[in-house]
Amino acid sequence: KVSFSVGEVTGNGKWSAKDDKFSLTIEGEEMVGTIGENNISFDDMLGMGVKVIFAKEGTDAMDPARYLTKEEKVVIGEWAAESVEELLGDGPQTSMEGVENISDALRLNFKDDRNVAVVYKGEEIGTFPWSVAMGYCMIESENPSLSVTINDDDTLKVDYSDDEDYYTFHCVKSDSK
């Protein structure tokens, strides 16, 4: 028997294992996963198109960095503004009031633990959770609001807004890692 819960949704079911396959039936919905070293992965959990990996507690399999997607790996690292554009401005600018160097206007340091440190105009704003889907990076922050598009040339377009400012930054990955 198995008990299953995701958020407030719960269910009961049965499981079985044979060779490297793990069968799980919850509330009549059957899923087949693959047994790995210290984990079990389901490519299409509950028919929702979502890959879910269960890791054995206390093992390296618990490290989320092991399961980064290609899109997520693109954003990992330090990024800095190369240009900035005001909402009603004259196009991209390479200087900005309040900073000596445009790269200090916005810096993003995406970590493999899925948190990003945000520095705006040289001041650390905070560290926020992030996720990537379909070419966009969502940063879980309301103020400032950060909307990130991953460009085809592996640069980032970042829309930044807070109570006072609204800018679009074009960011490049820093040379230093």
Feature roles, as predicted:
Residues K1-P129, A133-K177:
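Lipid interaction determinants
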